[in-house]
């Protein structure tokens, strides 16, 4: 798989650009702040319908405009597929597949399969559980696009149920007991959709675990062994069983946990149980990586998580596109060499670098130089001829 064409209109710093890309390695070169990462971000958005840098879509739209468009042509096994994504302010985003409108933007998920390496990856080890949940969900969606709808529906249920929990004090004051019947309905919906999401995550962690261990050993052979596990908020006594992916059983456990935490939820007005409260546990030896890993170990583990994702996508069928955003500048010589070796088999590698010296020696790559120019509308990124 490779991206043959990338077109942007009013996306971040790019007013208008059309890039013809090729299999093999391409390096986008330019000083920091010139818009290199925005190209990678656009491709990642086409992969997951989300940015790796921000949680909302508004910052993706160029200042002074009301919409951004990302257009890609992806070649997979000799077949071309065109995707256009329109990100708009104040209205629902739209998508087209091979020039035809689709009902939902989720319908284009899976056309482009990519793995992203970025400086933000350090947050997978040292950041909040939300960073690790997003890593799992993004990978699950790339592998099984239907998970995007599962997550979207679960998030809708959590929003509705949270609003209901916040309304309980007023309902009690009015003597309205019907709110508790409604809450039971939303409990069932949370358990149903939450169980499906948890099952997908646990199944994914089971497959990732041996790949993470192998990749970490390659990156840090002198370090302790790496392991991962899934911790569910419904398991008040400890981590969930890693083989437990039965949806009915998971739903029953979620309902039981909701009942057990009902008083606390009513007091605080928030949902305390569900996959939005879960975490991916990372360990080095018998210690949690967060708080105990050195800077080098943390980077090795972060890269190992991405390499493991890359390997799973390869096993699924077809080489995913590798997106490397300034990651070589963050790694020492040994880890840089290990990542470069892993990338050698990829059909397409798209890399950003502030200076060419950040690219591994001996890499044969096309170079695209990025600059910034200004006009009456402000500064914008451009590709130098």
Curated annotation (Swiss-Prot):
**Where is the protein situated, by its record's location annotation?**
Cytoplasm
Give binding positions for ATP. 30-37
Q: What SUPFAM superfamilies does UniProt report for this protein, alphabetically?
A: P-loop containing nucleoside triphosphate hydrolases
Which InterPro entries would you find in this protein's record? DNA-binding_RecF, DNA-binding_RecF_CS, P-loop_NTPase, RecF/RecN/SMC_N, RecF_2
Which Gene3D superfamilies did the record assign? P-loop containing nucleotide triphosphate hydrolases, RecF/RecN/SMC, N-terminal domain
The answer to keyword DNA damage applying to this record is yes
Q: Which PROSITE patterns match?
A: RECF_1, RECF_2
Q: Name one GO biological process term.
A: DNA replication
Q: Name any GO cellular component annotation.
A: cytoplasm
Which Gene Ontology terms cover its molecular function? Answer: ATP binding; single-stranded DNA binding
The UniProt function text for this chain reads:
The RecF protein is involved in DNA metabolism; it is required for DNA replication and normal SOS inducibility. RecF binds preferentially to single-stranded, linear DNA. It also seems to bind ATP.
What does the similarity note say? Answer: Belongs to the RecF family.
- State the protein's name: DNA replication and repair protein RecF
Q: What is the lineage of its organism?
A: Bacteria, Bacillati, Actinomycetota, Actinomycetes, Mycobacteriales
